[in-house]
């Protein structure tokens, strides 16, 4: 993937959960930030990943690092918030311009089916189910997501991750390493999967 230019993407507008419009760059102006771009708020894998990333929140806060979740639409936001899946601030990219500028692809109706049935997504859904995390199929099923970690003031991109499959996510140790912090968290147990079944 080409190098991300923060200046143009930084001027994209997001909507806070309270309805206020903010520029993306305002999120890294005063502190480093971990930006988690969800596929959608009802996505079971996204909910599990949000809960997993939230394990880092105390360590991020202790180091003055913001944790932010961004969704491509408002659909499912209320249920996502009520479920307590994510400990950071939440925003909506209503125009999906950040998603486009950061290279988070859109599936087609034909390409989403094999992606959704792949081994990676089965592994994560097994983890989610084991933790009682459910999902739904409301909203835009074709949008992918990823992560962007930016240094304070937008000095540089510390990590840019684009989902190749809906089950892809950044391991907690990679997030900590990108930020050069140590975190006292235990990642969720990884299930063992073959082509037919996943077990814990």
Swiss-Prot record:
Annotated EC: 1.11.1.20
Signal peptide as annotated in the record: none
Molecular function per GO: oxidoreductase activity, acting on the CH-OH group of donors, NAD or NADP as acceptor; prostaglandin F synthase activity
Family matches, as InterPro entries: PXL2A/B/C, Thioredoxin-like_sf, Thioredoxin_domain
GO cellular component terms given for this protein: cytosol
Any one biological process term the GO annotation gives: prostaglandin biosynthetic process
Record-linked Gene3D superfamilies: Glutaredoxin
Keyword NADP carried by entry: yes
Catalytic reaction equation(s): prostaglandin H2 + [thioredoxin]-dithiol = prostaglandin F2alpha + [thioredoxin]-disulfide; prostamide F2alpha + [thioredoxin]-disulfide = prostamide H2 + [thioredoxin]-dithiol
Compartments in which it is found: Cytoplasm, Cytosol
Top enzyme class: oxidoreductase
Keyword NADP: yes
Task performed by this protein: Catalyzes the reduction of prostaglandin-ethanolamide H(2) (prostamide H(2)) to prostamide F(2alpha) with NADPH as proton donor. Also able to reduce prostaglandin H(2) to prostaglandin F(2alpha).
Protein family according to the UniProt entry: Belongs to the peroxiredoxin-like PRXL2 family. Prostamide/prostaglandin F synthase subfamily.
Protein name (database record): Prostamide/prostaglandin F synthase
């Amino acid at each position: 993937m080409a190098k991300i230019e923060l200046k143009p993407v930084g001027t994209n507008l997001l909507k806070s959960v309270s309805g206020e419009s903010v520029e993306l760059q305002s999120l890294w102006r005063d502190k480093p930030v971990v930006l988690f771009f969800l596929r959608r708020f009802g996505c079971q894998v996204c909910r599990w990943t949000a809960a997993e990333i939230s394990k880092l929140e105390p360590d991020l806060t202790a180091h003055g690092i913001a944790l932010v979740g961004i969704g491509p639409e408002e659909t499912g936001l209320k249920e996502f918030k009520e479920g307590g899946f994510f400990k950071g601030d939440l925003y909506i990219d209503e125009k999906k311009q950040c998603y486009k500028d950061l290279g988070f692809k859109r599936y087609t109706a034909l390409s989403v089916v094999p992606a959704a049935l792949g081994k990676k997504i089965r592994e994560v859904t097994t983890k989610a189910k084991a933790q009682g995390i459910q999902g739904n199929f409301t909203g835009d099923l074709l949008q992918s997501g990823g992560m962007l970690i930016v240094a304070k003031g937008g000095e540089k991109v510390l990590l840019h991750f684009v989902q190749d499959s809906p089950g892809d996510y950044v391991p907690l140790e990679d997030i900590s390493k990108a930020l050069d912090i140590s975190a006292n968290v235990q990642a969720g147990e990884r299930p063992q999967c073959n082509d037919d079944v996943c077990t814990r």
